[in-house]
């Protein structure tokens, strides 16, 4: 099956990747779901909401600083690196991700569409101010005891991520859906396929005549529509795909 998928990817003209928390879990980042996930340690659905931030911004920022610290301790794994490699080879045209950890870019992927925002970006709760935290600023920023405030208007800054009950960023969602309509193959990597509207992406590819390839450690909500299901860790399966594509493309 791996050989067949490799041939399909090698011949494809418009392949995309759609990634979820599973790919980051292999880098040691706790997920919101699953037995080792954040759900057990914190009731994340109570913290990652606009209402929680209004009620107790300090608590929400403590939670996010803890998440940022976990992400800073993580490094891109072989799956992230393999996807960046597939982009360099001209096979993957974009990585659409539900993750907020920036690991795809760190691995070398250039065209990354972040549907749920970026944990290293902050935005003002009142005006249009946004800021991406440079690597050199991150540690000092984490150590600060003060609640971050907007340099333009003085209002509180919040993480530029999509919270429960919030709409996805329109520009990113439109771009993702447009790519899905044009894609001839989608690699669905490490996603449960239950968070909408992001989870529509494999369905759009399928409905537009494309091939759905799922890579996951266990079946998901996407599995029934997958043309190929490659069971295993993304960090093991994706590098093998890269290797096989290189071999058959010689």
Curated annotation (Swiss-Prot):
Its cofactor is Zn(2+). It is an enzyme of class 2 (transferase). Binds 1 zinc ion per subunit. It catalyses: N(6)-acetyl-L-lysyl-[protein] + NAD(+) + H2O = 2''-O-acetyl-ADP-D-ribose + nicotinamide + L-lysyl-[protein]; N(6)-succinyl-L-lysyl-[protein] + NAD(+) + H2O = 2''-O-succinyl-ADP-D-ribose + nicotinamide + L-lysyl-[protein]. Substrate binds at residues 64, 67. NAD(+) binds at residues 20-39, 98-101, 190-192, 216-218, 234. This is NAD-dependent protein deacylase. It comes from Pyrococcus furiosus (strain ATCC 43587 / DSM 3638 / JCM 8422 / Vc1). The gene is cobB.
